[in-house]
A protein has these predicted regions:
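Glycoside hydrolase catalytic-domain context in secreted enzymes
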Residues: 1-229
Length: 229
């Protein structure tokens, strides 16, 4: 769409539609046969959030995605399609070593090629974005997400992260949007506890934890995810 067309569309959208575009839901809310129980069933979002949601996480399979997208487009007042996203971390249908293992290869070209193949497979399923690569400098083995990272070295994280972004996004017809995460310092969570706080000096933060992002951003990833600390 041209800019003036987007501006016109935005001016016609209701406040609820605009808010909905910033919301991501899991596929369970669009599953006709799903039975929501427990905390999920008790804390259902308002119906208009489901009606106007902007993206869906974790739905795999082109038939499922087509069904959800068709039903959603039919009822949406402006027929804005859902954006389907998933954690394509180290492969989609074809599985490769975890990022920590890929880092041991010291071969960014292979890492980029693996990401390109994963993007092609994901794109064929209807996915348009992945929450990868994770380039948090990881030095505490107690942290449960160490395997998603490229390890303890800022330079290796930066080089491999850039290579992976290039692989995901290099082909216009089969590529998917990459997302650098988590900006920044998330790998230094206290006691290795997920979602915990971080206590590091400004110098350490800038020289070690921000460095991979400075390097990988040169590949122009479509997205950057903030840290949870």
């Amino acid at each position: 769409m041209e800019i003036h067309e987007l501006q016109q569309l935005l001016s016609e959208m209701s406040l609820q539609e605009k808010i909905g575009q910033m919301v991501q839901l899991t596929g369970v809310y669009f599953d006709k046969e799903a039975v929501l129980t427990g905390v999920v069933g008790e804390q259902l979002p308002p119906e208009w959030i489901i009606q106007y949601a902007g993206s869906v996480l974790g739905v795999i399979g082109k038939d499922k995605i087509y069904d959800i997208q068709s039903r959603y487009m039919e009822q949406h007042p402006h027929h804005i399609p859902l954006l389907f996203m998933a954690d394509v971390i180290h492969g989609c249908r074809t599985i490769y070593p975890i990022p920590l293992g890929q880092a041991c290869s010291f071969h960014p070209e292979l890492v980029s090629e693996a990401a390109s193949i994963a993007a092609s497979e994901a794109s064929s399923e209807g996915l348009r974005a992945t929450f990868s690569p994770m380039i948090d400098v990881s030095r505490d083995p107690r942290w449960g997400r160490v395997m998603e990272s490229f390890g303890e070295d800022p330079y290796v994280n930066g080089i491999m992260g850039k290579a992976m972004v290039d692989g995901y996004q290099q082909k216009a017809d089969t590529g998917i949007a990459a997302c650098l995460k988590h900006f920044a310092g998330y790998g230094a969570v206290n006691a290795g506890r997920e979602y915990n706080d971080v206590e590091i000096s400004q110098r350490t933060f800038l020289e070690q934890y921000v460095k991979p992002f400075r390097m990988a951003l040169k590949a122009k990833p479509a997205m950057v995810m903030t840290a949870f600390n």
